[in-house]
Each structure stands twice: as C-alpha cells, then as structure tokens.
A protein has these predicted regions:
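Residues that define the transmembrane beta-barrel architecture of outer-membrane proteins
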Residues: 42, 54-60, 84-91, 104, ...
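Classical Sec-dependent N-terminal signal peptides that target proteins to the secretory pathway
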Residues: 2-20
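A charged, solvent-exposed segment within the mature domains of Sec-exported extracytoplasmic proteins
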Residues: 124-156
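Residues on the lipid-exposed face of transmembrane beta-strands in outer-membrane beta-barrel proteins
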Residues: 60-64, 91-95, 110, 125-131, ...
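Outer-membrane beta-barrel initiation region
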Residues: 20-83, 87
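Flexible, glycine-rich linker and terminal segments associated
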Residues: 21-37, 144-190, 197, 203-243
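Outer-membrane beta-barrel strand-turn architecture
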Residues: 52, 66-70, 97-101, 130-133, ...
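Transmembrane beta-strand segments that form the barrel wall of outer-membrane beta-barrel proteins
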Residues: 42-50, 72-82, 105-115, 125, ...
Length: 243
C-alpha cells in the first residue's frame, strides 16, 4: 500500500517539473514523504478534474489522523495537483470536535499552498460545521508571495480572497450531496474574480468512486461561465472492497 501511494506521487510530480531546477526540492520532498508514510495512510484520494475549455487537473490528496479520540480529531492533510504544466503542493493541519450532544461536528484548519514552477505561495484559514443533513464551510486566502513572472513571461500575482459553501445531503440517498458556494478574490489591478458555484456529488457504494458535476456562474464579470466534472478514487475504499 505504502509503495503504491508513493509511486503515484512520483509519477504525477516528475511528469511535469523541471529536473534541473527542482531536483533538490524533489529529493527532499520524497525523502520526507517516504518517512511520513512509515505510518500507514488509510485515506488517500486520486482525482481527475475537467473544466470546460481547460486542460484536466490531476491530483492526489491524503488525510492522516494525528490524534483521534471519541470526541475530537487532529489531522494532517496534504495534496499535490498538476494542471497546465503547473504543480501545486498543499499542506495543512486541522482539528474537528464533536458537540456534547453529538449532533454536529465543527472544526478549524490552516493550510499552505506552493505552486512549485513559479514560486507562488499563499496561506489559508478555514472553518467548518457539519451535521447529519447540512454542512457549512468557509475559507479565507492570504497571499504570501509577491508578483512573479509566470508562464509565457506574463506577470502574475496571488490573490487574496474567500469562499463560503453550504452543503446538504440528498433525501434517501446517503452518498449524495448538493453544494452552493460563493467565492470572491481581489485581483490586483483588475476586476474582482467572484461568482457562484453549484455542484452535486455522489459516491458509488463499494467502489471507492465519487462523481461530482458542477457549474460556475460569474454573473456579469468578464469571465466565462463553465461546467466542471470531477472523478475521485479513494485508495482505501478500493483496497478494502477488493481484498
């Protein structure tokens, strides 16, 4: 299991990064990753996301409990995504606590994003509340890096922003959820990037597969509305159902 996950990380990462410029970073990353995987990761997803008019995004995300009790959990979450010849590493920690009456779960988290190719960096703080039928999530994003020269020598800068999302379980379908998200980013020197995102997600029982389809509506902004589709494989669920 450990070797399989590490191999997937290696394939995704090496396929699109410059060996000459990032060899030291890759060596350090995979050395740390292998040491971290000495304790088993049970909850790891591989995803393929396709957006209308854009190249697909491929990613791997893993969730590891660090301290798990009946009433709370502290966890590490890490992911690596590649899209349009750009690789982004995301690392963070969070804590979730079960309410005294066990009717809802609430939590806080903090993450760090690093786009490896052009050295863009940002931090985020998030909060969540979940019950058996509803959930509310919000994230606030803060730029760390300054303006950089990106792909095709275009000047790029990380944007500050936030999003807030509400989700609901579909009646009589335990693995189905519906989401509505509002997002807004402050684009330096340009129009704000804002809009609404509508999506639905369903898990296929006993397969480890989740399907998500959604639509981004940018309102009257200069951005084009777009559909997106996401397919996710959960490694632990696949293994548990085939063993």
């Amino acid at each position: 299991m450990k070797k399989y996950i590490i191999t997937l990380f290696t394939i995704i990462f090496i396929s699109a990064v410059s060996v000459a410029e990032t060899s030291e970073l890759k060596d350090n990353f995979f050395h740390s990753l292998e040491n971290f995987f000495d304790s088993k990761f049970d909850d790891t997803d591989i995803s393929i996301k396709s957006k209308e008019g854009n190249k697909p995004e491929i990613g791997i995300k893993t969730f590891k409990p660090l301290n798990d009790t009946e009433s709370e959990i502290t966890f590490f979450q890490g992911s690596l995504f590649t899209h349009d010849e750009r690789e982004t590493l995301n690392l963070g920690f969070g804590k979730r606590i079960l309410s005294d009456d066990e009717s809802f779960l609430y939590g806080l988290n903090a993450f760090y994003d690093h786009e490896l190719d052009y050295d863009h960096q940002r931090a985020s703080l998030g909060a969540e509340i979940k019950s058996s039928i509803l959930e509310l999530n919000t994230n606030h994003y803060f730029a760390i890096s300054n303006e950089k020269t990106g792909k095709n020598n275009i000047k790029e800068e990380v944007a500050d922003g936030y999003d807030i999302e509400i989700g609901a379980h579909a009646p009589y379908i335990p693995t189905a959820k519906f989401y509505t998200k509002y997002f807004e980013y402050d684009i330096p020197g340009g129009s704000d990037f804002e809009g609404l995102e509508y999506s639905s997600k369903i898990g296929i029982p006993n397969t480890g597969l989740d399907f998500e389809v959604g639509y981004k509506d940018y309102g009257n902004n200069s951005y084009e509305d777009q559909w997106f589709f996401n397919l996710t494989f959960n490694i632990n669920k696949m293994n548990s159902n085939t063993s």
